[in-house]
Amino acid sequence: MSTSLTWHDVIGKEKEQPYFHETLAFVAAERQAGKTIYPPQKDVFNAFRYTELADVKVVILGQDPYHGPNQAHGLSFSVLPGVPAPPSLVNMYKELATDIPGFERPSHGCLQSWAEQGVLLLNTVLTVEGGQAHSHAKLGWETFTDKVIAALNENREGVVFLLWGAHAQKKGNFIDSNRHHVLKAPHPSPLSAHRGFLGCRHFSQANQLLVQQGLQPIDWLPQLPQS
């Protein structure tokens, strides 16, 4: 089921809720106090900027943004051009190299071209303090991103959800698998990738599911954004 609805239509009201204002106010105050918060303010909502609701074909759920300098830019697992691919993304590239014929690991870790093709790269939590993983958990972001997933679940059909690791799988518990395709595997982090992420073939499976619906498959070779 396609939709003419936009993100603004389905989650606009959510942004007026008190908890959402409190979350934004907390993050703004932390920045004001001189703390380093990732990603930069202009990039916090990039997942929605690059992938409109009607265009979502695949969802890859992450946890919270990378907390090192110049890494996070609002897309889960992705880093800015010029920054080395972090370990989880390296394992995603390893899996792609065995799963997708002709895939060669790129020299960068920017996944913006995936987002532009309809891959919603959504973190559960949208900000983090520099060097402090999970520091912005339980602020309210989780409530907001639950609403995002609920909006996809209710307003779309045939979306492929890639849920890697217990956190993403719990987050995606309520996705209706009669309406959508839910693929589960361990997280690509070096701690768990060998337990079944490597060899999961989720990227080719996602494309098969898209083609079966008459949709264009994803070109999983990330292209650098045209500046």
Curated annotation (Swiss-Prot):
Broad class of enzyme this protein falls into: hydrolase
One Gene Ontology cellular component annotation held by this UniProt entry: cytoplasm
SUPFAM superfamilies: Uracil-DNA glycosylase-like
EC number per UniProt: 3.2.2.27
Reaction equation(s) it catalyzes: Hydrolyzes single-stranded DNA or mismatched double-stranded DNA and polynucleotides, releasing free uracil
Matching Pfam families: UDG
Active site, UniProt feature: D64
Coiled-coil regions listed: none
Keyword set includes Oxidoreductase: no
Recorded GO MF terms: uracil DNA N-glycosylase activity
One GO BP: base-excision repair, AP site formation via deaminated base removal
Keywords, in A-Z order: Cytoplasm, DNA damage, DNA repair, Hydrolase
UniProt entry tagged with the keyword Signal: no
CDD domains, sorted: UDG-F1-like (cd10027)
Compartment(s) where it occurs, according to its Swiss-Prot or TrEMBL record: Cytoplasm
Record family assignment: Belongs to the uracil-DNA glycosylase (UDG) superfamily. UNG family.
Described purpose of this protein according to its UniProt entry: Excises uracil residues from the DNA which can arise as a result of misincorporation of dUMP residues by DNA polymerase or due to deamination of cytosine.
Protein's UniProt name: Uracil-DNA glycosylase
Gene behind this protein: ung
